Amino acid sequence: MEPFGARLRRAMDERGPLCVGIDPHASLLAEWGLNDDVAGLERFSRTVVEAMADRVAVLKPQSAFFERFGSRGVAVLETTVQEARAAGALVVMDAKRGDIGSTMAAYAESFLHKDAPLFSDALTVSPYLGYGSLKPAVDLARESGAGLFVLALTSNPEGGEVQHAVRGDGRSVGATMLAHLAAENAGEEPLGSFGAVVGATLGDLSSYDLGINGPLLAPGIGAQGATPADLPRVFGAALRNVVPNVSRGVLRHGPDVTALRTAADRFAVEIRTAVTAS
């Protein structure tokens, strides 16, 4: 399979960089008039895929909202991933997995092995058992043509106590993760497959080298307070590689498919305007 970075760059060029989250939490199901059960989960997920999969570059299901329903919820997640990919969207599985050795390898196989029922184009992972603990996922992603998004500078305020902590060599933990990713992506064209999660809410990041030659998944737009107009200030010269993620800002307009598409299109235009004007 063609590497994830190349497929993502093409999707961003053709569809724009917007990523829409699939986050079926109980309050959102209620807003849609759906029960907080497997049937509601399935209806919600199918509607988002119908509305979005043929028009946005990336869909990002949050696995926890499916896992809470046990095996039946995971079955819905499998169908959601497969239908989204079949309709043309790239799927980033937001599972934030992180462990060591054979356990990390098993997590990787669950989402990155080409024959896995939950095979996704990319997976979010946590490096806070040490970046080297991610090696099984890095290796399998390369083999499968998939990608990773490593938590580096996240949008939640609590993340700073770890990610902004300064190591003995004077670099912050977040900067160290970015440096590892730059090394993974060295020489890759048109875009490396190993990205970072960098929050759009963080303000000026000019002290960080975001030039990792890989994608930057940017949560925080919409409900968390960031806007598309903030992207040039936050990401600077790396703006072209940013994949802005919007979840509630789009999903709250459901369950009407047309309303969901209109909301996504509005964000897409605002993002395009911000990128073009920078």
Curated annotation (Swiss-Prot):
Q: Annotated pathway, please?
A: Pyrimidine metabolism; UMP biosynthesis via de novo pathway; UMP from orotate: step 2/2
Q: Does the keyword NADP apply?
A: no
Report the EC number(s), separated by commas if there are several.
4.1.1.23
Please give the positions of the paired cysteines in each disulfide bond.
Answer: none
Q: Pfam families from the xrefs?
A: OMPdecase
Give the record's keywords alphabetically: Decarboxylase, Lyase, Pyrimidine biosynthesis
Gene Ontology molecular-function annotations: orotidine-5'-phosphate decarboxylase activity
Active-site residues per Swiss-Prot or TrEMBL entry? K96
Q: Name the reaction it catalyses.
A: orotidine 5'-phosphate + H(+) = UMP + CO2
Q: Which InterPro entries match?
A: Aldolase_TIM (IPR013785), OMPdecase_AS (IPR018089), OMPdecase_type-2 (IPR011995), OMPdeCOase_dom (IPR001754), RibuloseP-bd_barrel (IPR011060)
Q: Which biological process terms from the Gene Ontology are attached to this UniProt entry?
A: 'de novo' pyrimidine nucleobase biosynthetic process; 'de novo' UMP biosynthetic process
Give the family from UniProt: Belongs to the OMP decarboxylase family. Type 2 subfamily.
HAMAP family per record:
OMPdecase_type2
Instruction: Spell out the protein name for this chain.
Output: Orotidine 5'-phosphate decarboxylase
Read off the lineage from the record: Bacteria, Bacillati, Actinomycetota, Actinomycetes, Kitasatosporales
